From Swiss-Prot:
It catalyses: 2 [molybdopterin-synthase sulfur-carrier protein]-C-terminal-Gly-aminoethanethioate + cyclic pyranopterin phosphate + H2O = molybdopterin + 2 [molybdopterin-synthase sulfur-carrier protein]-C-terminal Gly-Gly + 2 H(+). InterPro entries: MoaE_sf, MOCS2B_euk, Mopterin_biosynth_MoaE. Gene3D superfamilies: Molybdopterin biosynthesis MoaE subunit (3.90.1170.40). Keywords: Cytoplasm, Molybdenum cofactor biosynthesis, Transferase. SUPFAM superfamilies: Molybdopterin synthase subunit MoaE. It comes from Dictyostelium discoideum (Social amoeba). Its EC number is 2.8.1.12. GO terms for cellular component: cytosol; molybdopterin synthase complex. This is Molybdopterin synthase catalytic subunit. The gene is mocs2l. Pathway: Cofactor biosynthesis; molybdopterin biosynthesis. Substrate binds at H107, R108, K123, K130, K131, E132. Catalytic subunit of the molybdopterin synthase complex, a complex that catalyzes the conversion of precursor Z into molybdopterin. Acts by mediating the incorporation of 2 sulfur atoms from thiocarboxylated mocs2s into precursor Z to generate a dithiolene group.
Length: 158
């Protein structure tokens, strides 16, 4: 099986089907399947959120996600079996999912660490932008990802 046949990527406006993606990465040689499911929460910095809207330059986003997947397949003690990543674009209401990362591996440590690496790297390198829409009608702004802002207490506006 080539590395490319172990990578499954989709950018879609459709609701994410968890069972479908778990089946895609299912592998009889796997002892673990780990995942991350990102959902739209109902609040941001005290404002009530109605929905998020995502946009991307799809060819570049897919290319960047492929790079991340290949890095994962070449690392983690060559224990990764398959990787599935789907990111929604368009409107994603509160409670619905915007991204799913599912990774199967021989052992749990590899898939858990790979999922963590994947989401952090996707959020910092892949050209996908979101706009929050608030229930009070206040100004909506496009936001890029700035992973370190939330963890280092930097006072960025997003």
């Amino acid at each position: 099986m080539s590395k490319e046949s172990r990578i499954f990527i989709e950018i879609s406006e459709n609701i994410i089907d968890l069972n479908y993606w778990y089946k895609i990465v299912s592998d009889d040689s796997s002892g673990a399947t780990s995942s991350f499911l990102g959902t739209t929460r109902n609040e941001f910095k005290g404002k009530s959120v109605e929905r998020l809207e995502y946009e991307t330059y799809e060819p570049m986003a897919i290319k960047e996600i492929e790079k991340i997947c290949k890095t994962i397949l070449n690392g983690f003690e060559n224990d990764i079996k398959k990787i599935g990543i789907v990111h929604r674009i368009g409107n994603v209401p509160v409670g619905e999912s915007s991204i799913l990362i599912v990774i199967s591996s021989g052992h749990r440590k590899s898939s858990l660490e790979a999922v963590h690496y994947a989401i952090d790297t996707i959020k910092s390198t892949v050209p996908i932008w979101k706009k929050e829409f608030y229930t009070d009608g206040s100004e909506n702004q496009w936001k890029g990802n700035c992973e370190s802002c939330h963890f280092n207490n930097n006072n960025h506006p997003h």
